[in-house]
Amino acid sequence: GAVAYGDLEVRDAVDFGAAETVIISDSRLRDGSLSHTIEDAERLGAAVVVLSSEFEPGKRLEGLGGSAALLRYKIG
């Protein structure tokens, strides 16, 4: 399926209602920079998954900008 990586792409996916699942690293959750995106995603019915940056999946997500979204459909 389609995936969005990084803050801007994830934000766009949420804005379009295309995000089915938003995945965020725990460090990005703590810094608060994505709080509005997370709130909007939950309000629009998307699942929000937090990955620990202490483990490999979270480390890989950090390498991709700390956020990603699995999409219901392709955008842009």
Predicted regions and their residues:
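Terminal alpha-helical anchor/extension segments at protein ends
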Residues: 1-76
